[in-house]
Amino acid sequence: MSKTTVFFSFIILLNFFSLLIFEKHDNLNLTKVIIRPGMNLEEISRELSSKKIVKNSDIFKIWVKLSFQEKKLKYGEFLFEKSNSIYDVTKKLTDGDVVFRKLTIVEGSYKYELLNNLKEIDPNSSLEYDDVSDLIVADTYNYQITDSAKKILHDIRKISNDFSQKIWSEREQTIPLKSI
C-alpha cells in the first residue's frame, strides 16, 4: 500500500469518527438524566443510551476516554435538549451544567415544616427536630437532586449564618446590642 492510500484512508477514518462525535442526535423532547455519585463510565453511557441521549454508548465511551474526560465527569441531574452530539453531551457532563431544585422557607414557618420538607427530599435521612437550627433565614435555597438532607440543611445553616453575620457587622454601631 502506498503512503497516499494510507494517508487518505486515515483522513476518511478521521472524518467518519468526527461525524460520529459531532453529529447532532435528535431527541423528541427535553430529557432529564440523573448521574449519581459513584457511577462509572459504563453505567453513565448505558443511562445516556437508554434515555436516547446518545445513539451509541460505545462511541460515547471511546470519545470520553480518548479526550481524557472520564475523571472530569460530574454527577447531578442534567437536562438535555432535543438535539445533542456526543461532544455536546460530554461538555455538559464535564462542565457540571446541572439542574438545581429550589426549597423555599417562608417567613414564620416552623422548624418542623423544614424537617418535613427535608425528609420528603431525602426519606432515608436521620435528621431530627433538634438538628434544625433556630437561626434560619427565610429564603429560597438551591439544591441538587443528589444532595442529602444533611447537606441541604448544612448549606441552609451556612447561608443563614453568613447573612446574619453580614447584617450584624453592618448594623448601626450606636445601637446597644452585644450579640445576635
Regions from the language model: what does each represent?
Residues 1-180:
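Conserved catalytic or metal-liganding residues and their short signature motifs at active sites
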